[in-house]
């Protein structure tokens, strides 16, 4: 998943694409863009300056799509089509939820349709039989944080159960405390696109 961030005012009309967590070792920059390349010469970030001249973009965070890829190819001569419409935010169902002794944390087994993930969660409202939004490994939150495999108190965690705040959702469509609680109109395994 590519993290796509844009705000005409606060980011000085610059589109920021976070392609990977690799550190750039080479930079290619001109008046239109700045590209970062990792040790394997793969693009790890792209910044496009004066982005508003390529269209009307009113969101701050969005899913990488064909339109953005065409702009990238035109401006930077880089093809990122393999990332188009990859969404690492999916609907999951908590099948098991056990408290981790002496902590506020829970170890959850979450069905995301094609697999069951172990996820450690600190939300008070985490419980068995709840449908939730799962940020899988590789997801990038609107804050820019990339979700990686982690370990808490020796317990491996393969994703994150998300709150509306963490996803930048402020429209009161979802509960504002704890992780998002979804009803059955959101099928398990389907993409969650409410923040794009």
What residue ranges belong to the model's regions?
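Phosphate-backbone binding interfaces of nucleic-acid-interacting proteins
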Residues: 1-196
């Amino acid at each position: 998943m590519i993290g796509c961030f844009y705000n005409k005012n606060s980011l000085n009309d610059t589109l920021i694409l976070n392609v990977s967590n690799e550190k750039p070792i080479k930079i290619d920059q001109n008046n239109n863009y700045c590209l970062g390349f990792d040790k394997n010469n793969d693009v790890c970030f792209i910044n496009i300056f004066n982005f508003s001249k390529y269209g009307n973009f009113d969101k701050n965070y969005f899913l990488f799509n064909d339109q953005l890829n065409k702009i990238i190819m035109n401006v930077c001569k880089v093809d990122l089509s393999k990332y188009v419409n990859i969404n690492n935010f999916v609907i999951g169902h908590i099948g098991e939820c056990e408290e981790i002794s002496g902590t506020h944390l829970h170890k959850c087994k979450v069905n995301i349709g094609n697999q069951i993930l172990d996820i450690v969660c600190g939300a008070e409202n985490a419980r068995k039989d709840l449908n939730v939004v799962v940020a899988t490994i590789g997801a990038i939150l609107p804050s820019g944080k990339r979700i990686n495999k982690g370990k808490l108190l020796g317990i491996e965690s393969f994703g994150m159960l998300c709150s509306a705040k963490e996803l930048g959702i402020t429209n009161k469509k979802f509960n504002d405390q704890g992780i998002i609680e979804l009803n059955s109109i959101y099928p398990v395994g389907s993409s969650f696109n409410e923040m794009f």
